[in-house]
């Protein structure tokens, strides 16, 4: 009992420290426009969601924006400052929709894609699950998909296809998200619009692999490597070469 109490105290202190080090949420959520001044607006918009310790400008810093430009893709690109506090305070979905995606639609964007790494990949999948039909598609690189207990539950069941959430009662957030991921078993919900990439030695390779198993194989990109930017840059280049953003959300 004493050890359990000590563990709870340590977890509380860790959470308090994490919150104190995390930027505050704002209304509207912050963004950074990667489009060069004077360039005409495109019909396609790529929205980049940062990872746990990153900021909205990281995709420019790490070469993603430049690589997209070199690929010839015709798209405007915006980084969204969706840091950890938005998730912890349960503001992520509301702020992304009301401050970024709905205004983008009003401006006339015909195709809107979310691109996210790690925590951002989780955010992209979560938004797509909770707002069906809002997005043209998503790219999730090494997405975080929940705590080890949740992942173990799905794994013990034999994977996402064999796993079923308990019937009756309210599901917690993690079970709701995995139930949403399970919906990608239906080809019409993911074909040509849900793309997954991860390193085979990534710390999230097990849950990402279970998601990969229900997606069309041509929409899954893997290489050797771990949870690092060099891996993600290579996966991004591979996806750009495959012209994933030309699919228009169709296979």
PLM features: residue spans?
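Non-catalytic cap/lid and distal C-terminal segments of serine-dependent acyl enzymes
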Residues: 22-251
